[in-house]
Amino acid sequence: IAIIAHVDHGKTTLVDKMILAGNILRDNAKQTGELILDNNDLERERGITILSKNVSVIYKDYKINIIDTPGHADFGGEVERVLKMVNGVLLLVDAAEGCMPQTRFVLQKALQQNLSLVVAINKIDRPDARIKEVIDEVLYLLMDLGATDEQLECPILFCCGRDGTASLDPDVPGTDLIPLFDTLLSTIKPPEGDPEAPFQMLVSSVDYNEFVGRIGIGRIQNGVAKVGEEVVVCDWHNPDLKMRGRLTKLYDFQANGRQPCDNITAGDIVAFSGLPDVTIGNTLCSPSNVEPLPFVKINDPTVEMTFSVNDSPLAGREGKFVTSRQIRDRLQKELLKDVALKVEDSATTDSFRVMGRGEMHLSILIETMRREGYELQVSPPHVLTKVIDGKTYEPMEHVVIDVPTQYQGAVMTGLGQRKAILQQMESLGSDRVRLEFRMPSRGLFGYRNQFLTDTHGEGIINQIFDGYDVWAGMIANRSTGSLVSFETGEAVTYGLFNAQQRGTLLVGPGEKVYEGMVIGYTASGEDVDVNVCKTKHLTNTRSSGSDDALRLIPISKLSLEGCLEFLAQDELLEVTPENLRIRKQILNHDQRMKAKSKLK
């Protein structure tokens, strides 16, 4: 089964409780505390699932394979292929928030594949839970997505994932997860594969291990496979592919890890190694019956950025991996695991076009590379357009916003300037309202900081890719200008004190700066050059000690997402393991002015 839910509706927590209830957790896993599945540092920090995880739980005499899918639309590439491995889905919906855009996205994919459905209303212990309304929302959503009668009559459970309880009646609190396990077994049919037929397996996911190389993961449709057996790799979309190889290792999925095994049979979800060139969508077959299995084509990327070698004056001082070859190798390695990502060489040898499913998709990759010791610079994100019948089409987003009523006007004004069209508005109780918009994807670049300011941190924004539409015209993404350093050196209090009167600072005393580096922003919308390395000329009567009396306003450091949102079209982001620095593409002031005058 696959568990689908919106970001932060509690699916990883619920799966953890299911593993504990299955009582087959390894001793060393008990000590980690929580979130066994989110085993990537970034996932634990952000509370989101990026990669699909596979685990299994033994209940009675059944082995239930559970796949935890990402709820964020940017990782939709993961979701689509994972659904090929399952017989049914458990739809998890927050009892207060109800159905959100990403729930719709993944559920639509599941219904298209005619999978059995079980619905769980989670977090029923929330004080603002509205269980009856959420049940209606789920049924309306299913009807809207064209669910079959069987799918509309799916069982509904009421859960508290944190406590590990489930109940069939919202008024009767549950004591354990047995009702959930029993419902899953009675609703979702076991795999129908034939163990006697020739071996056939679809590769739905790949991993990489330094010791055994490429690892393929998938479900066996038919037959049995043993370690050392010869197989043929073929592909539904590439009829010419016929590649022979041997399975050197086989792994079975247990409570929270892979266990080596000698043979596997139809219906099992397994991992294997020994085929270095196998990729997602390939079929492994017995040499006696080479027949590829159909595979869903992944949606195209919608956003691109340019990753290039860091060429700033501070380049090479903080990172371990700084050359174009090292960056290229790392991006190629990411392609082995991430099907929604595309990488192409650009016009220059030291930069690469990296395309993904959204800003978050690419920012997770940048943050991961940064933590691994890579140093690089990236361009502002751009949308990927299509030309159809001579017209330019751009990606659109369906945006759902929950805000307190008093900030509704500010949000509607801000999004209206970004070409958003209001499609629906509904009241959520006495003091909150839900707004639904359709707008160009690029209109959301740089909007989150403005949204947090407009709603005083009380708004919730969610988005989902919503097809393509005709180019909507110019959108001004940023209203502020940049404070640009025109000296290279170390920022000092005296220089910063003078600069802060021109705008808001992003660097503090003692930080290294260079010519062309953005050290803050102005409210005017125009770039202003400042010298933050300027020291006071000392005389007998002007001592340096009086600098201590200068008061600097505390600075706010931007996160990686904040930096990407902040970038203007003529700026780049320098990413190192220790620092994030925003800079102009042309560092020299005179050359920058000449380039600007040519554009006019």
State the predicted function of each range.
Residues 224, 276-277, 356-362, 404-408, ...:
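Helix N-cap motif at beta-to-alpha junctions
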Residues 160, 346-361:
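Short glycine/threonine-rich beta-strand-turn micro-motifs
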Residues 200-305, 315-317, 480, 489-539, ...:
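Conserved nucleotide-binding/hydrolysis modules and their immediate coupling elements
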Residues 1-93, 97, 137, 206-209:
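P-loop NTPase switch module centered on the Walker A-proximal segment
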Residues 253-261, 393, 439, 449-568, ...:
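Long insertion/accessory domains within large nucleic-acid-processing enzymes
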Residues 312-335, 549, 553:
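A short, contiguous, amphipathic alpha-helix enriched in charged residues
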Residues 31-33, 145-157, 191-202, 239-253, ...:
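Interdomain boundary/hinge elements
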Residues 116, 126-186:
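Canonical P-loop GTPase G-domain recognition
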